């Protein structure tokens, strides 16, 4: 997460440990941050991590027939976009990345920042793509529909909550995937006695009952597509 501008993998250490306790080998990655780089350097970084997993998985005991990707907020955006790019030669060419050799079975998208074209202000777009961002070759692909139409997006588990400031992004993606006939599951948490109505709750507070339920539901979705 972090809007492509801050945070590091250590922030998700506790969340990753909760996935590991449920029997998964978890690989957390860092990616380059704006404004030190411009988008889509982050896409290249994540694709490189997929390639590393494919090339080194056997040495670490990974089951490469059961690979899943999850991300929250900006990480959710990268999980969605890179999982799509991973299936499309046209998008690989656009983003300047090579084949990863990894078959991603399903993705978990937690409070994702999906529509960067319409859901992000011009100041952030300038940070991501430069001041002339509207003329960037990547600008048309900052909304999910363009990516979906050019790829075979894996089955997606989407979770948000009623007071998530990016709620509309997940809601719109659910509607778009439904319209496109893409397999997915959508969980929209409503108000509860705890904090499950906020942004990235299952990642930030993984031991809340609602968070544990969300994690278990996401992993059950993964298993159903393994």
Which positions does each model-derived feature cover?
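Alpha/beta-hydrolase superfamily serine-hydrolase fold, recognizing
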Residues: 1-226
């Amino acid at each position: 997460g972090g809007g492509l501008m801050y945070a590091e993998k250590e922030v998700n250490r506790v969340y990753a440990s909760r996935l590991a306790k449920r029997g998964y080998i978890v690989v957390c990655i860092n990616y380059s941050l704006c404004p030190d780089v411009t988008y889509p350097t982050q896409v290249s970084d994540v694709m490189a991590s997929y390639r590393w997993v494919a090339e080194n998985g056997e040495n670490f005991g990974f089951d490469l027939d059961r690979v899943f990707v999850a991300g929250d907020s900006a990480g959710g955006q990268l999980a969605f976009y890179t999982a799509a790019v991973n299936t499309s030669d046209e998008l690989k060419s656009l983003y300047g990345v090579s084949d990863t050799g990894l078959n991603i079975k399903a993705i978990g998208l937690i409070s994702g920042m999906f529509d960067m074209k319409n859901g992000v202000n011009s100041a952030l777009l300038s940070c991501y793509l430069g001041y002339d961002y509207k003329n960037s070759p990547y600008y048309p692909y900052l909304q999910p529909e363009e990516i979906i139409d050019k790829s075979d997006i894996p089955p997606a588990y989407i979770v948000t909550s009623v007071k998530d400031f990016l709620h509309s992004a997940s809601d719109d993606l659910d509607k778009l995937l439904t319209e496109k006939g893409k397999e997915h599951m959508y969980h929209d948490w409503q108000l509860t006695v705890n904090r499950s109505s906020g942004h990235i709750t299952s990642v930030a507070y993984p031991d809340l009952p609602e968070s544990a339920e969300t994690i278990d539901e996401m992993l059950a979705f993964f298993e159903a597509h393994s």
